[in-house]
Design a protein with these regions (language model features):
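Canonical positions in the second alpha-helix
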Residues: 63, 108, 158, 212, ...
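Helix-start (N-cap) detector for alpha-helical repeat units in TPR-like alpha-solenoids
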Residues: 72, 176, 183, 220-221, ...
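Bacterial N-terminal signal peptides
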Residues: 20-31
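Short coil/linker segments at helix-helix boundaries
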Residues: 82-127, 131-149, 187-207, 231-264
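TPR alpha-solenoid repeat register
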Residues: 74, 118, 168-171, 222, ...
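N-terminal leader/linker segments that initiate helical-solenoid repeat arrays
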Residues: 34-119
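Short coil turns that delineate tetratricopeptide repeat
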Residues: 68-69, 113, 163, 217, ...
Length: 309
């Protein structure tokens, strides 16, 4: 279930972009005679091309503390070397090299107002953005009650990069999809736990589906899924009292509250898209559960009368 969810997430994220990910695989020495005039930058390029990344970074740090810091190419080379170190270290999400590479790349862009280096910095920026997107996918699977939602942190960095690439870009639909997948991951855990410990996972899933439903993208799906999981939580809570007659009244009351909320979510979903038959079918099921609960309450209130007393 989780792997399928992540595949959908990746597909939706990459389908939006018209520019495909271009791996930065070209040699730094290309065009160096025209762009990189500084001797330290040239030395760093030679070191990087020979695989001596740490030495190249040391030389670049010296270059950036002097006159060569005014050269956009020097900042680009610095970003490239840091990116290579990030890859060399295994693309670790917590690696400081990625953030440092982003800082240098943004400085390169600021010093290149005519975008003469765009064909160089854009692929590198795309690569760094995609690396963050991969971390979002991993952290969706790692979500847990009471823990920071790291996926959101990585997504915010990813969204900033998309704005670097295109100031007019809107990542709201991608953000909604991430919230849906966070919600679905939590709800799947709640379902797997059944009677024992489902509550915290259900609350976490509700939180993320609610965040998704608040945005004006794919609201029907967010509300419908939230309704289905809310109904199922009511069923789970009712089942906890199956073998405990003393607790069944409270369990039924709790379940009915979930079913009522589920019906409200479904009604809202249908107002967003009344062409989906599943919405009406689910509402019929929830309404039947509420009706049966009302019948039980009526029977309890008239039990003596029904027994002929």
């Amino acid at each position: 279930m989780k792997d399928v969810a992540q595949s959908l997430f990746v597909g939706a994220m990459t389908a939006r972009r018209t520019v495909a990910l271009v791996t930065v695989a070209f040699a730094l020495s290309v065009g160096q005679g025209f762009w990189a005039q500084g001797p330290l930058t040239l030395e760093a390029i030679a070191l990087a091309d020979s695989g001596n990344l740490s030495e190249a970074e040391t030389v670049l740090n010296e270059a950036l503390s002097g006159p060569e810091s005014a050269d956009a190419m020097t900042w680009y080379v610095h970003a490239y070397v840091l990116k290579e170190r990030f890859v060399e270290e295994g693309n670790q999400p917590t690696s400081p090299q990625r953030n440092k590479a982003l800082e240098s790349l943004r400085e390169c862009i600021r010093k290149d107002p005519q975008d003469r280096l765009e064909d160089w910095w854009r692929p590198l920026l795309l690569f760094l953005g995609e690396s963050l997107l991969l971390d979002v996918q991993v952290e969706i699977r790692n979500i847990a009650p009471g823990q920071p939602v790291v996926a959101e942190q990585y997504f915010m960095q990813y969204a900033e990069i998309q704005r670097d690439l295109d100031p007019e870009v809107d990542t709201a639909a991608e953000w909604v999809l991430m919230q849906q997948q966070l919600g679905e991951t939590a709800m799947t855990e709640a379902q797997a736990l059944e009677k024992a410990g489902a509550g915290p996972w259900f609350e976490l899933g509700t939180h993320h589906y609610t965040l998704a439903a608040e945005k004006n993208q794919d609201q029907y799906r967010s509300l419908f899924n939230l309704a289905v999981h809310t109904y199922n939580q009511g069923v789970r809570e009712f089942k906890t009292a199956e073998d405990d007659l003393d607790a069944i009244d409270a369990a039924l009351e709790n379940a009915s509250r979930h079913w009522l909320r589920a019906s409200e979510f479904l009604e809202s979903a249908i107002t967003k898209d009344d062409t989906q038959a599943e919405g009406f079918e689910a509402l019929a099921i929830v309404s039947t559960a509420l009706l049966n609960q009302d019948r039980i309450e009526w029977c309890k209130a008239h039990i003596q009368e029904l027994e002929g007393h």
